[in-house]
Amino acid sequence: MKADIHPDYHPVLFRDLASGKVILTRSTATSSKTETWEDGDEYPIIEVEISSESHPFYTGKQRIMDSAGRVERFNQRFANFGKSK
């Protein structure tokens, strides 16, 4: 591989604003804000609105949309459409 062409890959904290959970991982993203982690070291922190900690798909708190009522209303409205009177 060529030297000096890859972005800086370093430890970064990600804070989920919806749940408040903070995750330490590695990323090429950076931030001017820093925060001290549990190990005593200081890392850049990036705040995200939603992550796997708060997304309904990953938390199992999905809402199922009930479209049956809308389909029934559509069928009632157009039940006689195209039929001669």
UniProtKB/Swiss-Prot annotation:
Record's InterPro entries? Ribosomal_bL28/bL31-like_sf (IPR034704), Ribosomal_bL31 (IPR002150), Ribosomal_bL31_B (IPR027493), Ribosomal_bL31_sf (IPR042105)
Pfam families listed in its UniProt record = Ribosomal_L31
The keyword Kinase is assigned to this record: no
Gene Ontology molecular function: any one: structural constituent of ribosome
Which interval of the chain is the signal sequence? Answer: none
Keyword tags: Ribonucleoprotein, Ribosomal protein
Gene Ontology annotations of biological process type: translation
**Listed PANTHER family:** 50S RIBOSOMAL PROTEIN L31, CHLOROPLASTIC, LARGE RIBOSOMAL SUBUNIT PROTEIN BL31C
Alphabetical list of NCBIfam families matching this protein = L31, PRK00528.1, PRK01678.1
Family of this protein: Belongs to the bacterial ribosomal protein bL31 family. Type B subfamily.
Q: What is this protein called?
A: Large ribosomal subunit protein bL31B
The record's gene field reads: rpmE2
